[in-house]
């Protein structure tokens, strides 16, 4: 009898305590890394050391066929052909990691063919139906646990660096109005809400299938996302609060690409806290919100010598490609760490970069090399490292958010080239949650 009373008491206590929620760690794998060369080439088997830290693995990216609006593989030879069969190679990882949820991610800026089709699809019930039917079939056929909509909406235009006359003309245009980025904003907002609702309806008899939304960077959620209408239909919303400054968007100025809070005298909306706050104040439960850390590092040339690299700085455009990813203006984390000064090198020794951390833990990390006496060789790079990823995870925990996303694993140090530890950025984010 005493045992029964004790059990009843424990049950009552358990009900009184708040439910324990487990933070999500969304790990994106960009399949385009499969065709890179040498140390940058990432195969499905390279994911193994990461998956014990991930709750979700998102395979990117599926794309929209322009003429039919069906969801198809970005690279059928890689994803579906029996030689590689990446789709099945990825979903088969669940056998070793039974708690892992594997989703197929759509768009993600990988779909470069006729990008206007993303808006056109939203305007047509028939197109949405074709997308949904083909998407659900594709996910089921290859064993995915659902779909992530990384929808390619039009982007907010970057700030331009203007001359005096240019600034005057810009002021005149603002006074009399300018052409909006998207002339059918309301229709596309309603269309995306309908897409989410209809896709959720198609999955309603498949209870294990999940549906997520990824907000790509520089997409204006106040325009395209009807938060109250979609938030209860999705398992998470992954907020992409990064890429505010890149060599592509701002080829004459460099700054922190993914600050948590607003640096002084900057756009108050270009930071993680502002992006998250919009969703929370619009009615999203905090546990539905996931914050992204993107591992792309942006390299620019022509750092101003007189300010010792302190951003924002004027630049001459993207820096030269690194030895692994081989993309102008973009570095992976191993390419960054290989350029940094280490204790065995003399301070300031060229061609290495000096790392500058942020003591406030609010803005991010950068590294730089001043120009030489001829004004050449200056470099400035904004990047995510284990410290900044950990700071974002700590922010997520302090706000009781749903988790973090790593975009993407191929740009982490998945070979352990920096210190010998594989996936140091992913690990740091996971440990701080």
From Swiss-Prot:
A GO MF term: chitinase activity
GO aspect biological process, one term: chitin catabolic process
Signal peptide: 1-16
CDD domains for the chain: GH18_IDGF
One GO location term (cellular component): extracellular region
Induction info: Induced 2 to 4 hours after treatment with 20-hydroxyecdysone (20E). Repressed by 8 hours after treatment with 20E, except in the presence of cycloheximide.
InterPro entries xref list: Chitinase_II/V-like_cat (IPR011583), Chitinase_insertion_sf (IPR029070), Glyco_hydro18_cat (IPR001223), Glycoside_hydrolase_SF (IPR017853), Glycosyl_Hydrlase_18 (IPR050314), IDGF (IPR015520)
Residues bearing attached sugar chains per UniProt: 220
Main location per the UniProt record: secreted
Tree of life domain: Eukaryota
Keywords: Disulfide bond, Glycoprotein, Secreted, Signal
Location relative to the cell: Secreted
Residue ranges occupied by any GH18 domain in the UniProt entry: 23-433
Disulfide bond entries: 27-54, 337-418
Pfam families named in the record: Glyco_hydro_18 (PF00704)
Family the entry assigns: Belongs to the glycosyl hydrolase 18 family. IDGF subfamily.
Note: Lacks the typical Glu active site in position 152 that is replaced by a Gln residue, preventing the hydrolase activity. Its precise function remains unclear.
Name of protein: Chitinase-like protein EN03
Native organism: Bombyx mori
Record lineage: Eukaryota, Metazoa, Ecdysozoa, Arthropoda, Hexapoda
């Amino acid at each position: 009898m005493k045992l029964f009373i004790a059990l009843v008491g424990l049950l009552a206590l358990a009900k009184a305590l708040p439910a324990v929620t487990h933070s999500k760690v969304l790990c994106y794998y960009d399949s385009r890394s499969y065709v890179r060369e040498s140390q940058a080439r990432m195969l499905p088997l390279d994911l193994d050391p990461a998956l014990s830290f991930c709750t979700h693995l998102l395979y990117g990216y599926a794309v929209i066929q322009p003429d039919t609006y069906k969801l198809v593989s970005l690279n059928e030879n890689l994803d579906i052909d029996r030689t590689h069969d990446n789709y099945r190679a990825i979903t088969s990882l669940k056998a070793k990691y039974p708690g892992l949820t594997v989703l197929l991610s759509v768009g993600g800026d990988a779909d470069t063919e006729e990008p206007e089709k993303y808006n056109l699809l939203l305007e047509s019930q028939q197109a949405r139906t074709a997308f949904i039917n083909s998407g659900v079939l594709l996910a089921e056929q290859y064993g995915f646990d659902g779909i992530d909509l990384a929808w390619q909406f039009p982007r907010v235009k970057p700030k331009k660096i203007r001359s005096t006359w240019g600034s005057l003309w810009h002021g005149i245009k603002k006074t009399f109005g300018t052409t909006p980025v998207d002339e059918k904003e309301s229709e596309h907002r309603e269309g995306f809400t309908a897409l989410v609702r209809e896709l959720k309806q198609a999955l309603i008899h498949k209870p294990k299938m999940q549906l997520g939304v990824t907000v790509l960077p520089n997409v204006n959620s106040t325009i395209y996302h009807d938060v109250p209408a979609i938030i209860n239909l999705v398992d998470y919303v992954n907020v992409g609060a990064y890429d505010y400054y890149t060599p592509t968007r701002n080829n004459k100025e460099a700054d922190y690409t993914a600050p948590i809070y607003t640096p002084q005298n900057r756009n108050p909306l270009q930071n993680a806290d502002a992006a998250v706050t919009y969703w929370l104040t619009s009615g999203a439960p905090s546990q539905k919100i996931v914050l992204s850390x993107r591992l792309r590092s942006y390299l620019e040339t022509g750092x101003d010598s007189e300010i010792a690299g302190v951003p924002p700085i004027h630049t001459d455009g993207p820096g030269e490609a690194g030895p692994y990813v081989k993309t102008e203006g973009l570095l992976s984390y191993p390419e960054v760490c290989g350029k940094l000064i280490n204790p065995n090198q003399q301070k300031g020794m060229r061609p290495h970069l000096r790392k500058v951390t942020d003591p406030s833990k609010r803005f991010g990390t950068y590294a730089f090399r001043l120009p030489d006496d001829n004004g050449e060789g200056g470099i400035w790079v904004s990047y995510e490292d284990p410290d900044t990823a950990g700071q974002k995870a700590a922010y997520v925990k302090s706000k009781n958010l749903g988790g973090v996303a790593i975009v993407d694993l191929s740009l982490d140090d998945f070979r352990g080239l920096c210190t010998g530890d594989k996936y140091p950025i992913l690990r740091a984010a996971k440990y701080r949650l």
